[in-house]
């Protein structure tokens, strides 16, 4: 560990045995890059609480750090109180707090944590001034913009800091910004702009509506090119565009996508972006640009399945626009189209839930294996219109401090529904959508070609979507499609009539694991009921005999049938088995 002027940490408990997705948390690494550019030594770490505490102990006990910065969001307020108390007690270092929750923190937080300063909004210019103040004794807190602090028993909230207009002046995040080496990480999160022109009533970013600023296309592509050059021999590279305004300007999207196509010719990678429904509806050509440039996944801000709630959220989109964009993304070839449906938000009721569920199922049908719907509870993020005025939206907020949930349990109630009721609706919706996806798979509503794209070709979680997890819970379908993917067998529609009798039917699962006895003459294999001669066709479907030979073998047992009658029975049985994804057909 090198000596640093400041270390930044974004730490969370391993709640629910889950690790937060730190890939998109650029803030503390961007701060480190900016400070390094301006003559200081800074590094950052994002990870689990106890792992981070060990790194803090190592740095502080060896006197390799002069100052600590902690990232605070709605989930880790209590972690930051503990860490700040610990650092101040054990090492007596200045501690500053920043992040999206910073504007909601108050005197009580300062008193409990003992932090020196809270940084509000954009941090680069403010933190640079704080470094000069704490380490070089330059200036005074009273003259630094964008902070809150307590002095002589009084809370001071300073005017907002000036925003950085020219984002191209910000340095790229490099490996020197990481407390632990990042060179083995093949995932790049990249921000192409700041600010948001939209005013979603549930969104922290939308509340502040700070001026939208963009990096130049050349600057964005240069960062990606540098990342790729540093990983010439890496595989499974994934680029995440994390800003909500990626699809705001059509020409800019076109220019970025043209650049991405050129870069992918040199070094292939998958990528993800966010998309705004209304702008994509007005300019659907952007979807073509994104798809042609190889985007694997797009996240759309849908949030609700009724126009009343969409309007309450000020989404600026309509139900018909959502369906149009979904179909356009599907037809353009984007493999994964993700969005959330919020439960427990504006005007929530049982009726709204039923409409949300029906709309989610409609989107799954439209997507034909591309659409993924996440179920989330409304989060009372700080300073949003719903959080500030819940009565306007017919809800009550029970836990603004996120003390009882981190997205896994409802934090609101209505006059008719408790938080438990809303949480049961969340559970029900997850189950219903899972069943609906399984039904679509069983009914062959998803093109085989698309199903085969779900299989992870390499060891990368980014290639795996919800449809893959759904498929993986259905052993016969998983085996059926895997055999097809490997080219070891075909489906009946891929076999010509003149060769049909020469192919070898082959079961895809072990019988003893999944057969159920219905009666002395009838069995059930998953959803397929088989009786009499059908059972024997299944038994002989081991890939060792052609259909012609199976017919001959069965003619010995069932000699009351003519050859043509037996042929029809066998072929119809095999069609039945294939429809249920229980057999495939090998050429040899």
Where are the regions that the model predicts?
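Glycine- and acidic-residue-enriched helix-capping/strand-helix junction motifs
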Residues: 15-28
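Flexible glycine/acidic-rich beta-alpha junction loops that bind and position SAM and/or redox cofactors
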Residues: 15-18, 198, 238, 308, ...
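Radical SAM [4Fe-4S] cluster-binding motif and immediate context
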Residues: 23, 168-336, 343-345, 358
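Short helix-capping segments at alpha-helix termini
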Residues: 38-40, 88-93, 137-139, 261-269, ...
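Catalytic cores of alpha/beta
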Residues: 106-112, 286, 347-362
């Amino acid at each position: 560990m090198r000596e640093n002027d400041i270390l930044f940490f974004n730490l969370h408990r391993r709640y629910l045995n889950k690790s937060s997705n730190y890939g998109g948390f650029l803030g503390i690494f961007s701060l480190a890059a900016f400070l390094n550019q301006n003559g200081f030594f800074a590094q950052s770490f994002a990870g689990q609480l106890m792992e981070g505490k060990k790194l803090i102990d190592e740095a502080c006990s060896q006197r390799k750090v002069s100052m600590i910065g902690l990232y605070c969001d709605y989930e880790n307020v209590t972690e930051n109180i503990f860490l700040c108390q610990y650092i101040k007690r054990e090492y007596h270092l200045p501690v500053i707090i920043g992040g999206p929750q910073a504007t909601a923190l108050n005197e009580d937080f300062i008193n409990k944590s003992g932090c020196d300063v809270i940084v509000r909004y954009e941090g680069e210019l403010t933190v640079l001034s704080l470094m000069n103040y704490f380490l070089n004794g330059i200036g005074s807190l009273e003259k630094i913009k964008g902070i809150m602090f307590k002095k002589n028993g009084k809370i001071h909230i300073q005017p907002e800091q000036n925003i950085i207009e020219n984002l191209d002046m910000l340095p790229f995040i490099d490996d020197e910004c990481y407390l632990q080496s990042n060179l083995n990480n093949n995932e790049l999160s990249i921000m192409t702009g700041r600010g948001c022109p939209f005013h979603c009533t549930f969104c922290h970013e939308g509340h502040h509506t700070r001026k939208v600023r963009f990096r130049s296309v050349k600057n964005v592509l240069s960062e990606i090119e540098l990342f790729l050059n540093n990983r010439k021999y890496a595989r499974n590279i994934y680029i995440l565009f994390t800003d909500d305004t990626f699809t705001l300007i059509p020409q800019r999207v076109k220019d970025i996508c043209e650049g991405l196509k050129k870069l992918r010719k040199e070094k292939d990678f998958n990528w993800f972006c966010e998309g705004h429904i209304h702008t994509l509806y007005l300019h659907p050509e952007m979807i073509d640009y994104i798809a042609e440039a190889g985007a694997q996944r797009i996240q759309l801000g849908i949030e609700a399945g009724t126009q009343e709630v969409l309007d309450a959220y000020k989404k600026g989109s309509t139900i018909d626009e959502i369906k149009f964009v979904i179909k356009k993304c599907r037809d353009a070839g984007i493999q994964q189209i993700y969005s959330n449906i919020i439960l427990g938000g504006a005007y929530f009721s049982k009726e709204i839930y039923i409409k949300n569920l029906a709309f989610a199922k409609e989107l799954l049908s439209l997507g034909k294996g591309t659409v993924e719907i996440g179920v989330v509870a409304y989060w009372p993020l700080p300073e949003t219109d719903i959080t500030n005025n819940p009565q306007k939206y017919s809800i009550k907020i029970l836990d603004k401090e996120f003390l009882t949930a981190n997205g896994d349990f409802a934090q609101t109630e209505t006059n008719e529904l408790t938080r438990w009721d809303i949480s049961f609706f969340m559970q029900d919706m997850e189950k219903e959508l899972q069943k609906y996806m399984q039904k679509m798979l069983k009914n062959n509503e998803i093109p085989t070609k698309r199903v085969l794209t779900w299989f992870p070709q390499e060891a990368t979680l980014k290639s795996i979507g919800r449809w893959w997890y759904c498929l993986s819970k259905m052993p016969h379908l998983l085996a059926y499609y895997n055999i097809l993917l490997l080219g070891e067998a075909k489906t009946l529609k891929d076999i010509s009539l003149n060769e049909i009798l020469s192919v070898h039917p082959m079961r895809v699962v072990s019988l003893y694991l999944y057969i159920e006895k219905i009666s002395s003459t009838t069995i059930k294999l998953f959803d397929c009921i088989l009786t009499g001669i059908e059972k024997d066709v299944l038994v002989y479907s081991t890939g060792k005999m052609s259909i012609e030979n199976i017919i001959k073998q069965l003619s010995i047992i069932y000699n009351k049938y003519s050859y043509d009658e037996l042929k029809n029975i066998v072929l119809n049985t095999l069609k039945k088995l294939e429809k249920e994804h229980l057999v495939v057909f090998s050429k040899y």
